[in-house]
Amino acid sequence: MVNTQNQISQTSELDYIVNQPYKYGFKTSVESEQFPRGISEDIVRLISKKKDEPEYLLNFRLKAYKKWKKMSSPSWAHIKHPNIDFNTIIYYAVPKLKKELKSLDEVDPEILDTFNKLGISLNEQKRISNVAVDAVFDSVSIATTFKKELSEAGVIFCSISEAIRDYPELIKKYLGTVVPAGDNYFAALNSAVFSDGSFCYIPPNTVCPLELSTYFRINNEESGQFERTLIIADRGSKVSYLEGCTAPQFDTNQLHAAIVELVALEGAEIKYSTVQNWYAGNKEGKGGIYNFVTKRGLCSGNNSKISWTQVETGSAITWKYPSCILAGENSQGEFYSVALTNNYQEADTGTKMIHIGNNTKSRIISKGISAGRSKNSYRGLVKVGPQSFNSRNYSQCDSLLIGQSSQANTFPYIQVQNPTSKVEHEASTSKISEDQIFYFLQRGINLEESIALMISGFCKDVFNELPMEFATEADRLLSLKLEGTVG
């Protein structure tokens, strides 16, 4: 009887730990300029005109819009959500600005205060670590820090709107080459209506002197966010990039449909890390962000490398598969992921590793943590082409269940068309057991700390791949999510 009471007590406390409010759910009161609801060719033209874009980019948008109109929303993922009414969404919403911003002094103090509350200081004198930040608020980039310091090394880091204006040769050459306008339903939508995002170019034989980071904030309840990121690492260069994101707490759902394109030329290396903490909805599953993202990297040069690392804790729905196309000989692709779902969250995420060149290597480490009534699925494709000789892949997919009602799924797809190649895949599903909790409690460690330690150990292979400045933050984010500070 005593044992049963202890089990009930532990279960109740565990439920309390994983069902706490979202820390970043505040809304910023700021006057905004926005287009009418709904999507049409007129809206696409308005966005392009508002941004004073060249004709080739308008044509790119219109082509994408026409393709999107002929496509259907994907239904194969292991997620369920109401049909999205795309005509109720505002596709362009920006804080009202009297003029083009020349310095942070001209940014609305409310917006600066928002990023300060999020721990993202846009004041270069107040930086804590070696990080340059591009801050995106709804449909516009508010500020990019340390541009002068980066430019001295030849590095271009700015909003994609600035890049379209100031570096048209690079945009024409690379935009849409990794993720074509009609790649998938949400990529086509983004290609038609994207408003801002980040652009980065690392010149040959240059190691970027700062970590680069973009922070995305959705503030408007009725608007979606459709940013686009393009990173080009020229031959022999290296760059590390981190993105983070949050949103206010609304009872309705907002749509986030982004594209990230990475291009690594000969001998170049790109490390792209994400800490995703969009609002996930309340414990009854009401509200939250629908997160439909296309991320893909192209190792076009020999001896190039792209590494994706992601920590996913937010969003009501997550649908994203950061991928690598290994075209160059001896190129490498890596994917390290922690995805934590809770309450009624649903995540269908994973990666694709496409081996084309000889002697290519890929590594996949995926950790899924499911709590409450959530569903957490890993979906991965490893494809070895017929001309990809001596290629190698290793995949490890581990799932951890917390509670009685959560789900974990693994959907691996493996296609090998070359007999000289080697592919390994292993998967496991485990549960935090009463014996494990009892072991910690007997040593004076409370339930919250016990679970945090077990989660940290479970995720260490991924956290070790994050940039040093953010590994501790990611560990803390998961702990806080389970302790009750970040719901």
From Swiss-Prot:
Signal peptide: none annotated. The keyword Plastid applies. It is found in: Plastid, Chloroplast. InterPro entries: Fe-S_cluster_assembly_SufBD (IPR055346), SUF_FeS_clus_asmbl_SufB (IPR010231), SUF_FeS_clus_asmbl_SufBD_core (IPR000825), SUF_FeS_clus_asmbl_SufBD_sf (IPR037284), SufBD_N (IPR045595). One of its GO terms (cellular component) is chloroplast. GO terms for biological process: iron-sulfur cluster assembly. Its main location: plastid. Pfam families: SUFBD_core, SufBD_N. Belongs to the iron-sulfur cluster assembly SufBD family. This is Iron-sulfur cluster assembly SufBD family protein ycf24. The lineage of its organism: Eukaryota, Rhodophyta, Bangiophyceae, Bangiales, Bangiaceae.
